[in-house]
Every structure is written in C-alpha cells, then in structure tokens.
Amino acid sequence: WEDVQMGKDIADQMIAKGADLLFIYANKVGLGCIESAKENGAKVIGFSENQNQLDSDTVVASVEFDFGAIYKWTISQYLAGDLKGNKTYGIGIKEHIFKPVYSDAVPEEIKTKIANEMKV
C-alpha cells in the first residue's frame, strides 16, 4: 500500500505487455502507477477519490467514493434490522456510492453513454 516504486515497477511491466489503460486501487502504490503511465504514454483511472488533478492528461477519470453515502446506507440498513452478520452486501452505483469524475480528455459522448448505462 505504501511502496510507490513497486507501483511504478508493476505498471511498467503491465505497459510493456501492452496495457494502455491502468486501474489501480492501492494508496501510494497508485502514485507509482500514475508516474509510469505518464512516462510511457498510458492512461490511468483513479480510484476512491478524484485523482484527476494529479495529472489530468494521464489520469483521464476517477471512480470517486461517497463515504457519506456509504455510512448513511449502512446505518439505515442497521436501523431497519436488515444488516445481518456473516453476509456480504453488494452496494455501489444503485446506492450512489460510486460516481465517475472525468478529466477534459474524456469526450462528452463517452460521458453521456456511461451516464445512460449507470441509470438504475
């Protein structure tokens, strides 16, 4: 989670094998991934927060978590008696937990297509 160089090394290997778009969720390791992508002409989708501002030419979009929505969903499920132990819950787009954040590099037609696909 903390080894920036490891993230760069792994991304270098992936790009050398033909990857041109990387999606990584690994805290500081992701910074190494972004560095590698920038050096090698690849693109990155950030995760958990808006990482576009790190390098909007390289990080073309991010999947942003709405942690407030996560907490509200969890508390509402608990209060309703619907949150059970030993069970995995799949939450995300439907509950407005995840949302895409785009850089200017993403064309409007792609943003619209994704928005239409995300409607639930």
Which residues does each predicted region cover?
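A residue-level marker of the well-folded mature domains of exported/periplasmic proteins
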Residues: 1-120
